[in-house]
Amino acid sequence: MYFEIEKQAIDAISDALDKFEVDNTLENFQVEDEKNFRLEFPPNPDMGDLASTIAFSLAKKLRKAPNLIASEIVEKLEIPEIFEKVEAIGPYVNFFIDYSNFSKKLLEYVGKDYGHLPKADEKIILEHTSANPNGPLHIGHVRNSIFGDSLNRLLKVAGREVETQYYVNDMGRQIAIIVFGITELGLKIEDQEGDKIDHKIGRLYFKANQKLNEDESLVSHVDNLIERYEGGAEPELNKIFEEVVESCLLGIKETLHRININHDDFVWEGQFVRSGEVDDMIKYFDHEGFVSYGDVTYIDLTCFQIEKEFVLRRSDGTSLYSTRDLAYHRYKATQGDVVLDILGSDHKLAAQQINVIFKEILREIPPEVIFYEFITLPSGSMSTRKGVFVSVDELVDEAVKRAADEIKSRNPDLTDEEIKPMAEDIGVGAIRFFIAKLSPEKHLTFKWDEALSFERGCASIQYAHARACKLLKKSGKDVSSLAVSDDWVPNENEKDLIRTIAKFPQVIEDCANKKRIHNITQYCQDLAGAFNKFYKAEQVIGSDVEDTRLVLVDRAKTTLKNALDILGVPAPQKM
């Protein structure tokens, strides 16, 4: 619906430009060029519902001030029926929607899939989370998971085909340290502290790592395990490695599932060694003359302005994570049209190396990377290596507990059984929303008072959805059978809500094109705010336009739920 009225506005301006008589100065100007011809949402409804900046693009060609050009465009423009008026406000051409005409059409258009864009002929392989399976997910990982999953949801709504992958580091040193703890120190996973198996494995890893720090002579034992597992010739050893990884992944998947995250595929890095793909790739580099030999086998990247060499093999002949990662990226490139990685900012050098190797040596399209800064609690950052971390499980438990306490204080008559599901929805929603609301490039400190605020946080948005559900239920009517009155002329509160609902598809398109999700959180806040303003000011049940307003409430509820779904935030029907 939004794109329809946008097209009408663009066509109207295009027709107006055709009427210009300026000695062929517009001869080479293409009005279809999106870079020169775009519409925006004005910051204030008093300035209209849509605005064009085309006067800026024409100023140099016409050698006129943009505000004069905007006025000329408006003079020559024929106003489409969907608009009440068009005005030149400064250098902008501003369109004002005729809400007596538009509102009924919009409310009839909005359905359960509202916001979903047409299918695009593009498949994206999106890798996110990919934490080492040597312990539970901690708060340092969770921004990757939440951003990656929300981006996956956004891109799917925007019409892209997306496959999410978790890259499993089964050949990493961390797993070998755990196997060392089991096979040589006699440690047992089941004997460790923790309610979940990933926590038990994390404790075992910590103990084994401590032992290695105390006795450096044991480090060679870990090196030996890495070499033997990579060789793949010992079924019993392979089984121990694989059971450790699979067990830890069970716990990690459980954590991810609790915060509404699931992956389509888990790809083990070992498969690229066992299949010979890593060896074949190194042989190719060698054949092309890019491999250097010394203590290690490496590619010298200084000719590509990267000082640090890209190591392919250790002195003992084993491959590195970076080598296997390169093979994995080549594999991903065969699975889709776009390869998209979500990586912490500490991976920038490695990503730069991969980028150069793909472009300059392999002559292939490199992966697209979105970097994020790390998230901390006010007390500081965390590390699994030192055994001092706040796990995602603990973070969610704390969020749910705080939410339950707040619900209880506001609703003392509710039972614990009634509170439990609401607290889970609010706690999970608070974490996901708070982390999603900031651009990934910015450092984020997790603040409980902001995240769980029932006035400003995600809970206030969830409450708007629950409030709409309660109102519809209270009406006792089947909203699907209700019709919008033909003579309904919306007031200012209704207009504001309709205007906000109408923006949703454009917000989806903009965010998907930029591959960023934080503006979805802002949209949720705007929509919840517009609904709450309407709810407080306008009578619905018992009003002269009861059916129409019930339809408006239902469409606001649907849009808000769809927006929250993109963020992976529950939309409770009761709070």
Curated annotation (Swiss-Prot):
<dbReference type="InterPro" id="IPR001278">
    <property type="entry name" value="Arg-tRNA-ligase"/>
</dbReference>
<dbReference type="GO" id="GO:0005524">
    <property type="term" value="F:ATP binding"/>
</dbReference>
<keyword id="KW-0648">Protein biosynthesis</keyword>
<feature type="short sequence motif" description="'HIGH' region">
    <location>
        <begin position="131"/>
        <end position="141"/>
    </location>
</feature>
<dbReference type="InterPro" id="IPR036695">
    <property type="entry name" value="Arg-tRNA-synth_N_sf"/>
</dbReference>
<dbReference type="Pfam" id="PF00750">
    <property type="entry name" value="tRNA-synt_1d"/>
</dbReference>
<comment type="similarity">
    <text>Belongs to the class-I aminoacyl-tRNA synthetase family.</text>
</comment>
<dbReference type="InterPro" id="IPR014729">
    <property type="entry name" value="Rossmann-like_a/b/a_fold"/>
</dbReference>
<dbReference type="GO" id="GO:0004814">
    <property type="term" value="F:arginine-tRNA ligase activity"/>
</dbReference>
<keyword id="KW-0030">Aminoacyl-tRNA synthetase</keyword>
<dbReference type="GO" id="GO:0005737">
    <property type="term" value="C:cytoplasm"/>
</dbReference>
<dbReference type="Pfam" id="PF03485">
    <property type="entry name" value="Arg_tRNA_synt_N"/>
</dbReference>
<dbReference type="InterPro" id="IPR008909">
    <property type="entry name" value="DALR_anticod-bd"/>
</dbReference>
<keyword id="KW-0067">ATP-binding</keyword>
<dbReference type="InterPro" id="IPR009080">
    <property type="entry name" value="tRNAsynth_Ia_anticodon-bd"/>
</dbReference>
<keyword id="KW-0963">Cytoplasm</keyword>
<dbReference type="Pfam" id="PF05746">
    <property type="entry name" value="DALR_1"/>
</dbReference>
<dbReference type="InterPro" id="IPR001412">
    <property type="entry name" value="aa-tRNA-synth_I_CS"/>
</dbReference>
<dbReference type="InterPro" id="IPR005148">
    <property type="entry name" value="Arg-tRNA-synth_N"/>
</dbReference>
<dbReference type="InterPro" id="IPR035684">
    <property type="entry name" value="ArgRS_core"/>
</dbReference>
<keyword id="KW-0436">Ligase</keyword>
<keyword id="KW-0547">Nucleotide-binding</keyword>
<dbReference type="GO" id="GO:0006420">
    <property type="term" value="P:arginyl-tRNA aminoacylation"/>
</dbReference>
<protein>
    <recommendedName>
        <fullName>Arginine--tRNA ligase</fullName>
        <ecNumber>6.1.1.19</ecNumber>
    </recommendedName>
</protein>
